[in-house]
Amino acid sequence: MATRLQYENSCDVGVFLKLTNKYCLVGQCGSKQFLHTVENRLADHIPVVETSIAGTRIVGRLSAGNKNGLLLPNTCTDQELQQIRNSLPDDVVVQRIEEKFSALGNCIATNDYVALVHPDIDRETEEIIADVLGVEVFRQTVSGNVLVGTYCALTNQGALVHPMTSIADQDELSSLLQVPLVAGTVNRGNECVAAGCVVNDWTAIVGADTTATEISVIESIFALQGSKPSNIINNIRNSIVDNV
């Protein structure tokens, strides 16, 4: 099931959240209503950690992680690193890395088995991603965009990518990732799909502007609430008929 939320005045929930199957990071915010809603949705299953990274709230864009590990930029302070380490399960490896692209969440899209990364990411960073996250790593673009972590939302169940991704590119990405994949949008047509939603294998949090049709596609491709990827066309067709 997908939950609509707004982080203060922003619908870009993926900028301020990092959600995996093992934990959720939440950027420190003045409004506790957002945090309480996230905790009510997730806290029975995984730890929800309110934190900052490099003194900022954009934890979703600065970090990359999965059930095995969490990667943080070298601008993350010692205090932040220690707090995050102490708050996550013991079997989650938390590592700070030296990388010129410090917005790791924009440059890495990962599930528990495979990761797409910015084509120009350091070779050493690629090795750390493979080691800490326990994934196979592919240097890739999404619809010609190098910021794969911005334009691809990925779980073990499926992937949502930039709406202008060609059918050939969708097929290639789906083959690499070994999951069903669809091109789509969030927040009423926004192309930055991973900035507008966070997803794991059983739930999704999407920006408050996300339409019913966009939510139907998200719930279908990520197999939430028992939806199947084959339902996507019917969901879109029904929405078009309703609008007509």
From Swiss-Prot:
Matching InterPro entries: eIF6
Q: Name one GO biological process term.
A: assembly of large subunit precursor of preribosome
Which Pfam families does the record associate with it? eIF-6
Q: What does this protein do?
A: Binds to the 60S ribosomal subunit and prevents its association with the 40S ribosomal subunit to form the 80S initiation complex in the cytoplasm. May also be involved in ribosome biogenesis.
UniProt xrefs under NCBIfam families: eIF-6
HAMAP family reported in the protein's UniProt record? eIF_6
Protein name, per record: Eukaryotic translation initiation factor 6
Tell me which species this is from: Dictyostelium discoideum
